[in-house]
């Protein structure tokens, strides 16, 4: 097994909402502007943060999760990045030690040093206690130092620095500023494509970081390069239509890469804007925000008829979360506004004010076992008997249904297709290739 070396840093925090994404994006934009090739990863299954980080770095962002992605695939992704980049940045998820697996587990497994980001607003000496806890809760954690976020002044930054334990590295204090705050909504950050001033925000964050913090490259980390695992090109010649617009944008880059590696040609289309489907053998409707675009989705009757005709012809259709909601008879948003949708999956859903499911999921389908995750604010009433139900590896009761009507497969689960390439191919292969 060969090795690849590259400077790397995992940006983590004691909790969500501390500014991990802002700091990671600022670092990525700063180094990219200096001509470095930056590759960014996101711990866990999140879709929204990677959209911001991809814009900041100028390169696709991949998820890293020791369970959903798997250690071997995570190692391959990191080694590939190390072979082509000048800097690897990994944004953590939730708090540093939260979840199973956690961001700390990933840092320890691959020897990536951790930069702790702590929201220093309205805080003084307690900052030092939080920093000490992050560094010492797990003795074998490679910990690089801390950065204060949302700092009120230079004097405030000095106070935070001076309360750190002896020997702990102080990266600096990023000031509080509306110029680079990233807005959010019910599922997380607002999508990158919806922020007209995103590049200005990222540049402002990079400028502020350069003026207030250490931004030198971290020490190189050695990554083992695994032997390549050849894939059978079982989707050779298959054309897959992939919905991608403001309604349906929750797509793992690794899923798209895999489908192409299996031989498929991807044709992207917009259920919001397009009047017809591209000429395709199969359809993939990912998650997103259909509830924010009910009027336009309901009004695009030409697209609705095209998707209904695709299903009636017995062609494969895979729908995840928001894509599944699009297939229902009716979707109602949290304010009571309703939209009549495709009617391919008998049932209705309603958006709630609170989160209704958040869990990793593994499900056994006739095509094979797939892993993924679920994260939604809606409740579903569906008359179809589930084909299967997911299982949460952490013992939670969440067991998302997978529905099957002919070649239509739909679920709240966002599938991580590289967890079983053969199953992914079977779900999307036309009948002539499935025998």
From Swiss-Prot:
Active site: residue positions: 321 (nucleophile)
CDD domains from the xrefs? CobB_N, GATase1_CobB
Bilayer-crossing regions = none
- Per the UniProt entry, the Enzyme Commission number(s) are 6.3.5.9
Keyword ATP-binding in annotation: yes
Q: Which residues form the GATase cobBQ-type domain?
A: 239-422
| One Pfam family this sequence matches | CbiA
Q: Where is this site: Increases nucleophilicity of active site Cys?
A: 414
**Entry cofactors:** Mg(2+)
What does the record's free text say on domains? Comprises of two domains. The C-terminal domain contains the binding site for glutamine and catalyzes the hydrolysis of this substrate to glutamate and ammonia. The N-terminal domain is anticipated to bind ATP and hydrogenobyrinate and catalyzes the ultimate synthesis of the diamide product. The ammonia produced via the glutaminase domain is probably translocated to the adjacent domain via a molecular tunnel, where it reacts with an activated intermediate.
Q: What else is known?
A: The a and c carboxylates of hydrogenobyrinate are activated for nucleophilic attack via formation of a phosphorylated intermediate by ATP. CobB catalyzes first the amidation of the c-carboxylate, and then that of the a-carboxylate.
Question: What family name appears in the similarity comment?
Answer: Belongs to the CobB/CbiA family.
Name of this chain's protein: Hydrogenobyrinate a,c-diamide synthase
Q: What is the organism of origin for this protein?
A: Pseudomonas aeruginosa (strain ATCC 15692 / DSM 22644 / CIP 104116 / JCM 14847 / LMG 12228 / 1C / PRS 101 / PAO1)
Gene this protein is translated from: cobB
């Amino acid at each position: 097994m060969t090795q690849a070396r590259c400077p790397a840093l995992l940006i983590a925090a004691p909790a969500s909402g501390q500014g991990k994404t802002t700091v990671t994006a600022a670092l990525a934009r700063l180094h990219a502007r200096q001509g470095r090739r930056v590759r960014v990863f996101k711990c866990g299954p999140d879709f929204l943060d990677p959209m911001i980080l991809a814009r900041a770095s100028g390169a696709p962002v991949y998820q890293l999760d020791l369970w959903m992605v798997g250690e071997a695939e995570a190692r391959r992704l990191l080694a590939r990045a190390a072979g082509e980049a000048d800097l690897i940045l990994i944004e953590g998820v939730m708090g540093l030690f939260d979840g199973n697996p956690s961001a700390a587990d990933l840092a320890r497994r691959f020897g990536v040093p951790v930069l702790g980001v702590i929201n220093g607003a309205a805080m003084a000496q307690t900052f030092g206690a939080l920093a000490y806890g992050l560094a010492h809760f797990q003795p074998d954690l490679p910990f690089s130092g801390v950065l204060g976020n949302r700092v009120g002044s230079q004097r405030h930054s000095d106070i935070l620095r001076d309360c750190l334990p002896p020997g702990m590295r102080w990266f600096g204090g990023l000031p509080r500023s509306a110029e680079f705050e990233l807005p959010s909504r019910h599922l997380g950050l607002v999508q990158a494509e919806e922020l007209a001033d995103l590049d200005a925000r990222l540049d402002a964050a990079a400028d502020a970081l350069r003026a207030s913090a250490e931004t030198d490259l971290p020490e190189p980390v050695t990554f083992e390069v695994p032997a390549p695992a050849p894939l059978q090109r079982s989707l050779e010649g298959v054309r897959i239509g992939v919905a991608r617009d403001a309604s349906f944008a929750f797509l793992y880059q690794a899923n798209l890469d895999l489908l192409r590696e299996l031989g498929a040609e991807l044709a992207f289309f917009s259920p919001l804007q397009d009047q017809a489907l591209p000429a395709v053998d199969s359809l993939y409707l990912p998650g997103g925000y259909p509830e924010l675009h009910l009027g336009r989705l309901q009004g695009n009757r030409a697209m609705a008829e095209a998707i209904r005709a695709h299903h009636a012809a017995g062609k494969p259709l895979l729908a995840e979360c928001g894509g599944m909601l699009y297939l229902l008879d009716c979707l109602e948003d949290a304010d009571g506004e309703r939209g009549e949708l495709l009617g391919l999956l008998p049932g209705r859903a309603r958006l709630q004010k609170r989160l209704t499911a958040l869990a990793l999921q593994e499900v056994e389908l006739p095509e094979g076992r797939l892993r993924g995750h679920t994260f939604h604010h809606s409740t579903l009433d569906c008359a179809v008997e589930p084909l299967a139900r997911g299982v949460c590896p952490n013992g939670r009761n969440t067991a998302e249904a997978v529905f099957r009507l002919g070649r239509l497969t739909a679920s709240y689960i966002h599938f991580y297709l590289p967890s079983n390439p053969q199953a992914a191919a079977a779900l999307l292969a036309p009948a002539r290739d499935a025998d």
